[in-house]
Amino acid sequence: MHEESWRTMFPDYTQYQTTLDHYSNLEPASIGTLQPRLSDAVRRFSALNLQPRILRITAPDNTLYRDYIIELIKKYQFNSNNNTTCSQTSEKEQPIIIAGENVTAEKLFGAVYPPLEQNTLAKPSVKHGLLHQAHNGYLILSITALLSNPSLWPRLKRTLTDGVLEWEASNKKVVINLPPAEKLNVKLVIIGDRYLMAELDSAEPDLSTGFAMYGEFEQDLLLNDASLEDYLGYVKAIIDHHQLPQFADSNAVTALLNAGARYAEDQTRLPLCLLWHLNLLSEASLESDGKVITAANIKASLRAKEYRESYLPERAIADIHHGQVLIASDGKEIGQVNGLTVVEMPGHPTAYGEPARISCVVHFGDGDISDVERKVELGGNIHAKGMMIMQAFVATALDLDQALPYSASIVFEQSYSEVDGDSASLAELCALMSALSSQPINQQIAVTGAVDQFGRVQAVGGINEKVEGFYKVCVHRGLTGNQGVILPKTNLSNLCLNDEVIEAIKAKQFHIWAVENVDEAIPLLTDKPFRSENEEDETILSLIEERIDYFHHGDLSNEVGILNKIRICIANWFVQN
């Protein structure tokens, strides 16, 4: 347990400075360089002439990603006649047909129309569909088209499997002579995000049993010397392809890497999202007036995005500033702690962090710890799991011979929407220990982290948003120099805080404490150790044990014993009568 330096609040790229300085000398890199698994899937799919006939690619379904996938297909096209690799420009390039999201049976398969002339010699007219256009090539199909029109799939599956298309009349009520079935050699590529792929899997289990090959567009990359060069070449290719201004210097490249670490929520990874890069670089180009992009331009574009999306977060924080939502940032309270939450609003593009007051009260009872959120059906399953894990740790830590003679209730105060996740279980545990021991908690410190049954503190998501949410409350009321956040040590690699928070930490006006277990967290909040090997030391557990002892052997025990006897007598009287 120790206070973290401001230098750990953001990524450190000094070891890569030589590579950053030589950015301008790097060659643009193709997307396949950073997508080895997807490239291998496309290469093998192109080479196979029999099965599978379908390649599923998990990726955002938009034109930008489709264009890059088509680029990969063209790179690995094979000659179906001799099964040997063609050159980059094949003698006879295989067609690649893109089907839009609005695909009908007629558009996909074609149809047969009745003859215009009403005589027996007239032949019906045939309209070919996208499958015919993709003969001996590839059909790129959006997964949305299949899910929005499920009746397409059985016929499409049969056509791809058999290699034969059976014609159907455009009007089923009109009897016409259909042409003979046609042979088709088409490979289907389905593109869609992971959630839509899951829907398709549930409707067609064969897709996961070898009927289709699988590939995915990876969204991030582990940072090292080799991957950084490839990544910067990838960024350079995006800039060249979309005719954007180049970076002014290595500081601009570092600013991009910092923004990427924040986006990926990991100091050790680089994002590969095409849309994110294109949006950020386009807006940075706007800030630079079409000249070279500087670090200041990138930071300005990030601030502009934050400003556009700041209305809801600012309204939420304003409710705290005006006292409508009660959050303490100074003083001490028993059974109350500042937890940290991430709020996701439907229709809003980004999640934001805000503190939440978690309170716990105890009373005489049978040891039950009541989760109010769960009882009123505002708590999700993961939150309920976190509560039960926390209760198991408390029972183990107290090591009682009999049930705890107190019951407790824990609640997120002024929370009126669903709460889920286990990231508040450390805060809930601290509130419970405070209430049981009657030891107050320092309200200048907020807490986030999940706990396991052994008291170890585990990583949580949205760590940057959580820290910045509590900082906004503190800075509005005035920084005291003692405020800060307790977070899991395993979350340090996820930190990429904004410049204002980093400067406050650097000036010792705001603090970050990283903890590995409950024993490290509770002393920071209560100024007392959680437990000690020396039995004479006053600890949180010893205070709880004294309270339980007083209950069992003090005057309070006699009073409660008499009340229990009266309660039992009344119950027996009702049973007998």
Segments (PLM) and residue ranges:
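Conserved ASCE/P-loop NTPase catalytic core
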Residues: M1-D201, D206, M213-N224, L228, ...
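Peripheral, non-AAA+ core regions of ATP-driven protein-machinery
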Residues: M1-E27, D40-F45, I70, H128-L131, ...
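Short, surface-exposed charged micro-motifs
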Residues: S359
